[in-house]
């Protein structure tokens, strides 16, 4: 009985701790202090996202090395979590450009069911926050996914297509760049090309190489638009 009680208390404690930092603001809080000041000629770019962004630094570290690129991906996160931490992990780092890649975990219902409008609204809200703070915005498509291993009952394809359509239209109407990873990484079944993925959702090193080329082109375009 004592063991069960202790286990129950531990579960309650961990659950309470998680609820206190639902957007996971603590993950980058110390590292963010290094970026409180930016330099005049520094082309700082912050990458906001989930595990697809976070793992980029692991699978292809050379993409970030020697550049003013800051990775602020957090595994498993959904767009409402990102929206809450957007000021702390993006705006407060004083970037010239923010690159947003989000949505697949919303579709996977990691933090509960989400509609196309909920997902796209959150992405658009992040973009508008950046714009209001003088930061140029690159909005990325959700990558293709035929299925989601941790949510096998969900067919992600319809929502992926629908969200991508909404955010692409928004980007075009508001002078922002829409970064289309999807078209370069999709197979004939609307899934992630096998050679580009470590699973049906996450890119591997080869996939990140494709993404890096596309991201560099988009960043160059933004920084040289004038």
Describe every region a protein language model picked out:
Residues 45-48, 69-73, 97-102, 137-141, ...:
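Structural recognition of the beta-strand scaffold that forms the well-ordered cores
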Residues 116-140, 166-176:
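Charged, glycine-enriched surface loops/patches
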């Amino acid at each position: 009985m004592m063991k069960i009680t202790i286990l129950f208390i531990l579960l309650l404690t961990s659950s309470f701790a998680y609820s206190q930092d639902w957007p996971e603001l603590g993950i980058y809080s110390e590292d963010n202090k290094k970026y409180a000041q930016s330099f005049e000629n520094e082309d700082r770019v912050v990458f906001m996202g989930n595990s697809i962004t976070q793992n980029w630094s692991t699978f292809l570290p050379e993409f970030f090395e020697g550049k003013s690129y800051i990775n602020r991906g957090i595994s498993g996160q959904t767009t409402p979590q990102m929206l809450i931490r957007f000021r702390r992990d993006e705006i407060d780092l004083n970037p010239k450009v923010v690159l947003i890649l989000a949505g697949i975990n919303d579709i996977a219902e990691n933090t509960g069911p989400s509609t196309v409008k909920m997902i796209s609204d959150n992405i658009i809200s992040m973009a508008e926050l950046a714009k209001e703070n003088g930061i140029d915005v690159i909005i990325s498509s959700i990558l293709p996914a035929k299925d989601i291993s941790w949510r096998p009952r969900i067919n992600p394809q319809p929502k992926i297509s629908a969200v991508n359509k909404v955010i692409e239209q928004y980007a075009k109407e508001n002078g922002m760049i829409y970064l289309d990873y999807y078209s370069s990484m999709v197979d004939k079944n609307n899934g992630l090309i096998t050679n580009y993925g470590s699973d049906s959702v996450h890119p591997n090193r080869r996939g990140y190489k494709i993404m890096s080329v596309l991201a560099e082109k988009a960043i160059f375009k933004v920084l040289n638009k004038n």
